[in-house]
């Protein structure tokens, strides 16, 4: 079983990460990782990046842009 600290550390190591990436890296269920990310956000340890903060910069040209609803997290206060 993973801990909140492991999830927070994984986000810190990645800089920015989504639940799917963390689920794979930590070998944990997606629903567990999503719940932990939400808890860390409520605690003020992580923050959600807005939907326009695309990691690749190509979202505006992507045909799936309307269906892509990936939430990305980073350490709170990190710029």
Curated annotation (Swiss-Prot):
Domain of life (superkingdom): Bacteria
A Pfam family: FeoC
Gene3D superfamilies in alphabetical order: Winged helix-like DNA-binding domain superfamily/Winged helix DNA-binding domain
Annotated binding of iron-sulfur cluster, by residue: 54, 59, 62, 68
The keyword Cytoplasm belongs to this UniProt entry's keyword annotation: no
InterPro entries recorded: FeoC, Tscrpt_reg_HTH_FeoC, WH-like_DNA-bd_sf, WH_DNA-bd_sf
Keywords noted in UniProt: DNA-binding, Iron, Iron-sulfur, Metal-binding, Repressor, Transcription, Transcription regulation
Positions in coiled-coil regions: none
The keyword Transcription regulation is annotated on this UniProt entry: yes
GO MF, any single term: iron ion binding
Biological role stated in the UniProt entry: May function as a transcriptional regulator that controls feoABC expression.
Family as reported in the entry's similarity comment: Belongs to the FeoC family.
Protein name: Probable [Fe-S]-dependent transcriptional repressor
Organism: Photorhabdus laumondii subsp. laumondii (strain DSM 15139 / CIP 105565 / TT01)
Gene: feoC
């Amino acid at each position: 079983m993973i801990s909140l600290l492991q999830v927070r550390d994984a986000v810190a190591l990645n800089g920015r990460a989504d639940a799917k990436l963390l689920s794979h890296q930590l070998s944990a269920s997606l629903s567990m990782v999503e719940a932990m990310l939400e808890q860390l956000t409520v605690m003020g340890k992580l923050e959600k990046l807005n939907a326009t903060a695309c990691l690749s910069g190509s979202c505006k040209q992507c045909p799936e842009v309307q269906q892509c609803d990936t939430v990305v997290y980073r350490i709170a206060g990190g710029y």
